[in-house]
């Protein structure tokens, strides 16, 4: 009985050890950082050699060995295992197997605390640059399509109700502005976070005679970070990229929502390529906007990753805590999500077919030029705006009774709507014309064709300089 108990206890102990290893290890996800880990280690070894801590021969052996490790990982020859715990130990262990004793010297004047911060910062900076380029391409696509539709009318909406006539190019440029701001957020984050953690060690620096400026320069950073304790505790750079991605995905979700509406039977403003829509499994007549719906849906998981890391960080005492091992998976997931989302949205916009007639006919519903009538009465008749507002309501009521849009009323019909309009000038009809209304909004940033073309020229210059 005693032997049986001992066997059971040993099985339980082994099982618990395996569970603990799986719980504690990060290797199965932080292996994503292998390239940054090796890049940081090469820079660190060069600095150690320049300071006389390593010999030149040792440094060369380390660098050559690290390139071999990188090659083995990329070819699939290297097999990741929980035994390594994390990417740092995996690389160092394999390096030491390849080159022997010099591999054991690589970690001199370094802690995994500053090492992981360096790896993760390099990853975030790399992805910041690549996402920026994707956003630039997306802005260019919106500008290209907008340039084709500076005179195409579309109902401008507030509260999802018809409000005023716009041109479709102007509407698309609203999204170009959103994604331009996203680009600029990534751009400013890159500059703010471009400082090297390497050499901060565990939390207080190192007694070794190191040169942090050299490693910062080698790795492409602006300078070393200023405070070792803050450095190993800091995950602001990860939070920033998560916020930037969340904002970008929010903008992607908004255009996706409009694409879903515009492609519906009720709107029919655009037709998406068959590549980005699917048919129903039971209703053969349907064409479902699956891709925009997925883009809209994926926004939630990205928001979740941001909230998750904010929650991890909110109560951590200085300096390093194991909690921050939970910082990476959400970032990796959000990066991959936004990369594929931008790429797919770009193609959806490029390939959509715009139904110009449907858009322009929709402008004849909802009295989009009612505000123009009120503005006319203020400007031409010197009426107080509130008086003009109520007179315009009478004209709208008349149009409804005649089953017409206000833009379709004749001068005689307008004059019958209210006693104040009995002698109104005939040019009022021109103010109610949809295209004239759109072009009348010629203030800076407005929807007129002239202003829209000016905005397009602005974006073309912006794109040339990026």
Curated annotation (Swiss-Prot):
Q: Short name of one Pfam family for this protein?
A: ASL_C2
Q: A GO CC term?
A: cytosol
This protein's UniProt keywords? Amino-acid biosynthesis, Arginine biosynthesis, Cytoplasm, Lyase
Q: What InterPro entries would the database entry show?
A: Arg_succ_lyase_C, Argininosuccinate_lyase, Fumarase/histidase_N, Fumarate_lyase_fam, Fumarate_lyase_N, L-Aspartase-like
Q: Which GO terms describe its molecular function?
A: argininosuccinate lyase activity
From the UniProt record, list the reaction(s) this protein catalyses.
Answer: 2-(N(omega)-L-arginino)succinate = fumarate + L-arginine
Pathway given in the UniProt record: Amino-acid biosynthesis; L-arginine biosynthesis; L-arginine from L-ornithine and carbamoyl phosphate: step 3/3
Which PANTHER family does the annotation name?
A: ARGININOSUCCINATE LYASE
The cross-references to HAMAP family, in alphabetical order and at most eight, read: Arg_succ_lyase
Could you identify this protein by its name?
Answer: Argininosuccinate lyase
Q: Which organism is this entry from?
A: Aliarcobacter butzleri (strain RM4018) (Arcobacter butzleri)
């Amino acid at each position: 009985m005693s032997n049986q108990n001992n066997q059971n206890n040993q099985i339980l102990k082994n099982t618990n050890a395996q569970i603990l290893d799986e719980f504690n290890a990060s290797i199965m996800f932080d292996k994503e950082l292998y390239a940054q880990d090796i890049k940081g280690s090469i820079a660190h070894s060069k600095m150690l050699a320049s300071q006389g801590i390593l010999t030149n021969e040792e440094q060369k052996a380390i660098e050559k060995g690290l390139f071999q490790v990188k090659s083995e990982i990329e070819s699939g020859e290297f097999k990741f295992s929980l035994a390594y715990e994390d990417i740092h130990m995996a690389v160092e262990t394999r390096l030491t197997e390849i080159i022997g004793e010099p591999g054991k010297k690589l970690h001199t004047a370094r802690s995994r605390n500053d090492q992981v911060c360096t790896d993760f910062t390099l990853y975030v900076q790399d992805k910041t640059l690549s996402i920026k380029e994707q956003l630039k391409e997306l802005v260019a696509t919106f500008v290209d399509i907008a340039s084709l539709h500076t005179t195409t009318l579309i109902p401008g909406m507030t509260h999802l109700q018809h409000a005023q006539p716009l041109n479709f190019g102007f509407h698309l440029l609203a999204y170009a502005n959103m994604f331009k701001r996203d680009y600029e957020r990534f751009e400013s984050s890159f500059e703010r976070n471009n400082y090297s953690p390497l050499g901060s060690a565990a939390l207080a620096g190192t007694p070794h005679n190191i040169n942090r400026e050299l490693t910062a320069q080698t790795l492409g950073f602006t300078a070393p970070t200023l405070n070792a304790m803050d450095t190993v505790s800091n995950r602001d750079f990860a939070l920033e990229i998560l916020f930037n991605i969340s904002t970008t995905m929010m903008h992607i979700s908004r255009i996706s929502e409009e694409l879903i509406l515009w492609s519906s039977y009720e709107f029919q403003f655009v037709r998406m390529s068959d590549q980005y829509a699917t048919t129903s499994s039971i209703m053969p007549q349907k064409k479902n906007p699956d891709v925009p719906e997925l883009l809209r849906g994926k926004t939630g998981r990205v928001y979740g990753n941001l909230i998750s890391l904010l929650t991890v960080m909110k109560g951590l005492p200085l300096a390093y805590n194991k909690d921050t091992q939970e910082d990476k998976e959400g970032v990796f997931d959000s990066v991959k999500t936004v990369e594929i989302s931008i790429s797919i949205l770009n193609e959806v916009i490029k390939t959509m077919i715009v139904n110009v007639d449907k858009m322009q006919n929709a402008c004849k519903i909802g009295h989009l030029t009612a505000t123009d009538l009120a503005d006319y009465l203020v400007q031409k008749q010197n009426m107080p705006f509130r008086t003009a507002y109520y007179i315009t309501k009478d004209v709208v009521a008349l149009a409804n009774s005649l089953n017409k849009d206000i833009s379709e009323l004749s001068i005689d019909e307008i004059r019958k709507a209210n006693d104040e309009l009995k002698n109104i000038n005939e040019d009022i009809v021109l103010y109610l014309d949809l295209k004239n209304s759109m072009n009348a909004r010629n203030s800076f940033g407005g929807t007129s064709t002239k202003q829209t073309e000016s905005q397009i020229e602005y974006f073309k210059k912006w794109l040339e300089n990026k």
